[in-house]
Amino acid sequence: MEISSLIEPLFKNFENPIVSMLAVSTVETIYMVFLSTIFSLLLGFPIGVLLVITKEGGIYEMKKFNTILGIIINALRSFPFIILMILLFPLSRFVVGSTIGATAAVVPLSIGAAPFVARIVEGALLEVDHGLIEASQSMGASNSTIIFKVMLPECYPTLVHGIVVTIISLIGYSAMAGTIGAGGLGDLAIRFGYLRFKLDIMIYAIIIIIILVQVIQSVGNYIVYRRQKKLGK
């Protein structure tokens, strides 16, 4: 069942139809971004770890595998999102049974963001002092312990900032997805604000997107601040 069919009855009694449309579209956008963030992290996070541990000098050095994986990631990152979404229509239809709607958009949003997550995780892990890794190895720590107990905790603030950037990017992607039937604030801004010349609706949609971005950035900054305060930095 599409998310819009579940949430529209909740807002249909609003006196102002514009408020009702904005509320539904905002929930659709949050729904798309929330799910695609989870799935892109599930896809991209382990790939980012693999990029680091299999590189030359890594704890699981596999140079050929690392090179091939890097090429694939770079190829996926180079695709414009609109084109990628169209190419993934068959996969969306296979997974959710449709190519239209917020749920269908989660598939290309997740796959489109996963390579960026992988590179963000890779960059964060590469910032970890190699001396810490060598010290852990000298004390007999297993590779999994080094990854999960040393490397990931050490780059926590950078990872949080990277995840925030990913979420904000997904908000922009979701707006683009709205132009080809995904719903959300992007769809509302195009269908009513642009095609029907209702400038006020477009402005309201943009304001809500800006608010969402500001809230997410503030939450991310607060999480990093709390972590650094806990560590005494």
Positions of PLM-derived features:
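Transmembrane alpha-helix signature in integral membrane proteins
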Residues: 22-53
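Loop-to-helix entry region at the N-terminal start of transmembrane alpha-helices
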Residues: 24-32, 77, 81-116, 201-206
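Membrane-embedded alpha-helices of multi-pass transport/permease systems
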Residues: 42-47, 104-107, 111-133, 163-164, ...
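C-terminal transmembrane helix and the adjacent membrane-cytosol boundary/short C-terminal tail
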Residues: 50-56, 202-233
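Cytoplasmic-entry segments and transmembrane alpha-helices of multi-pass inner-membrane transporters
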Residues: 50-87, 109, 114, 120-123
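Short helix-to-coil transition segments within interhelical loops
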Residues: 125-155, 195
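Transmembrane alpha-helices
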Residues: 143-174
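Non-cytoplasmic
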Residues: 162-211, 218-221
